[in-house]
A protein has these predicted regions:
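A generic structural micro-environment signature
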Residues: 7, 17, 35-36, 42-44, ...
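C-terminal motif of bacterial Sec signal peptides marking the signal peptidase cleavage site
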Residues: 25-28
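Positively charged n-region of N-terminal signal peptides that target proteins for export
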Residues: 1-15
Length: 276
């Protein structure tokens, strides 16, 4: 039986629907899309999206037949939240990082009946070198942000209940949300050049990464974890090298798609060298 990282305690004081939603959000089993759009002057937007639809469908199957599912199927929303409104609650960020986080927005789209659940973070940047900082902030605060939002949406039962998120005293430190493979690569975003190179020394110990290994087990059970990167350039690419890269006809859009299995089979698949 696959052991989930985040414990869900369906006690009487915890609303069943809220518990099920938290299970979906913090299971880590979801698809991710990162999209970078660069304007002529070097500014642009960075978007990180989490698609939890597959896990939501599995959760519905698990709860099939329960009376509470009638309430669960009614969950529906499409809302945008300015992160500046919650920046003070991001305790794991310093003051400078909070100011950057405050420039971002989070769009939540949920329709339980249609098995749709998406979280999409969007941040502006004035130059491409700022992308790395935005990614680091999301790595540190994404779970905290979504937990805070889930608490507001679901009430006291959602999001930040310590026992639900496996953060009681004595519990091991919470892992990052989802399949975070970025730490195994060195990425550089310069004017006119983007590169991503595998850290072979770190990757040699990937089998010790308990979080990724547990997600790999999920994938082997039929819950494939897809990862997609899209880069929209202001001009045609002069160079676009990488095993997983696809270049549009006008050479301005670069797409890379792969799975967690691809990462374990050949991590160089996610390397790239782009010049424009």
């Amino acid at each position: 039986m696959l052991k989930l990282r985040y414990k869900i305690l369906f006690m009487k004081k915890i609303n069943w629907v809220a518990g099920l939603v938290v299970l979906v959000v913090f299971s880590g089993c979801f698809d991710t899309v990162e999209e970078v759009t660069v304007a002529d002057n070097g500014s642009g937007t960075f978007v990180n999206s989490l698609d939890m639809g597959k896990m939501l469908g599995l959760a519905k199957t698990m709860g099939s037949g329960k009376d509470e599912m009638k309430d669960f199927d009614k969950l529906k929303m499409d809302t945008v939240i300015n992160l500046k409104d919650i920046k003070d609650s991001l305790k794991n960020l310093n003051a400078a990082e909070k100011n950057i986080a405050a420039t971002g927005k989070l769009r939540i789209q949920m329709d339980a009946n249609d098995e749709k659940m998406n979280f999409s973070f969007s941040f502006p940047f004035s130059k491409t070198s700022e992308i790395d900082g935005i990614q680091n902030i999301l790595k540190k605060a994404k779970q905290n942000i979504i937990g805070d939002i889930m608490q507001k949406i679901m009430g006291e039962e959602g999001g930040k209940n310590e026992s639900m998120l496996g953060n009681e005293d004595g519990d091991e430190k919470k892992d990052d949300m989802g399949a975070n493979i970025d730490e195994y690569y060195t990425s550089v975003y310069e004017k006119g050049k983007f590169t991503r190179k595998l850290n072979k020394e770190k990757y040699a110990h990937v089998e010790d990464d308990k979080s990724l290994k547990s997600l790999q087990e999920m994938a082997q059970l039929g819950m494939a974890i897809n990862m997609k990167t899209i880069i929209n350039l202001p001009k045609p690419a002069k160079k676009a090298e990488g095993k997983g890269l696809k270049l549009s006809d006008d050479k301005k859009k670069i797409t890379m798609e792969g799975t967690l299995d691809d990462f374990f089979e050949d991590a160089s698949y996610f390397e790239y060298n782009i010049e424009y």
